[in-house]
């Protein structure tokens, strides 16, 4: 069947008018919502998270977390001899590169928000390396603004830690979305990063712990304490790291 020039012209005119209506609608939406005009770029990737291992204890009176961390990374593409981690409002005690089972100290700069670490050499994208950090997180002293949905961004919450309010349970829990996990452990705190996870929590023996993945061990830690280790073997974003400690009840079922 032969299509006339008139039909072709009408068809193209229809397409053009449809595109015009679409672009007009988009432009109108942007005028109505100025937030849509903001260009939200993904941060450049210099290093990729591979695995994050944490060993944490809590000071209920001061609302502190005492942490040890072994974070394994690799350069994203280009070789690099430096590493930048998000770490909000912490005391940084030690940073080392793990070499043959030994910790070799590294030089670093810290401005209360970012850790800039000089590695021991330049690593290629085919090489993994592990950095050890010893730190204290102080979430209640962190002055960070949240969003309309979540009014603050301190990441780690101590609930009725002294037991003074008899109507509230004593609990600890985290809320990391979208970039608040770096208030309780140093990391590259962006949803585009993905890492495996292992968390060991030392808590009073009377409490139950919750975290990502599977509970792989529970060991007495002396003085009425117990260390629980949770392990997640699926890569996930840092904001999904989760801890909860409290007088929870455990229910088990099979199906």
Task: Give, region by region, the residue ranges found by the protein language model.
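Acidic/His-enriched low-complexity segments
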Residues: 26-255
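Bacterial Sec-dependent N-terminal signal peptides
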Residues: 1-32
């Amino acid at each position: 069947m032969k299509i006339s020039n008139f039909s072709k012209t009408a068809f193209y005119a229809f397409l053009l008018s449809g595109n015009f209506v679409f672009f007009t609608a988009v432009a109108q939406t942007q005028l109505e919502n100025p937030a849509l005009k903001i260009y939200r770029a993904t941060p450049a990737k210099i290093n990729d998270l591979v695995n994050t291992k944490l060993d944490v204890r809590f000071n209920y009176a001061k609302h502190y977390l005492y942490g040890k961390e072994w974070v394994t990374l690799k350069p994203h593409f280009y070789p690099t001899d430096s590493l930048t981690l998000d770490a909000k409002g912490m005391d940084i005690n030690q940073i080392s590169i793990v070499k043959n089972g030994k910790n070799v100290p590294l030089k670093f700069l810290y401005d209360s928000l970012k850790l800039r670490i000089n590695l021991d050499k330049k690593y290629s994208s085919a090489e993994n390396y592990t950095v050890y950090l010893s730190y204290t997180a102080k979430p209640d002293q962190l002055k960070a603004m949240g969003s309309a949905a979540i009014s603050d961004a301190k990441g780690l919450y101590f609930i009725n830690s002294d037991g003074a309010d008899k109507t509230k349970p004593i609990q600890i829990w985290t809320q990391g979305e979208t970039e608040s996990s770096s208030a309780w452990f140093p990391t590259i705190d962006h949803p585009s990063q993905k890492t495996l996870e292992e968390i060991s929590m030392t808590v009073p023996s009377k409490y139950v712990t919750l975290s990502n993945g599977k509970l792989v061990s529970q060991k007495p830690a002396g003085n009425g304490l117990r260390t629980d280790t949770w392990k997640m073997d699926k890569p996930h974003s840092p904001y999904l790291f989760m801890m909860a400690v409290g007088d929870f009840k455990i229910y088990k079922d099979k199906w």
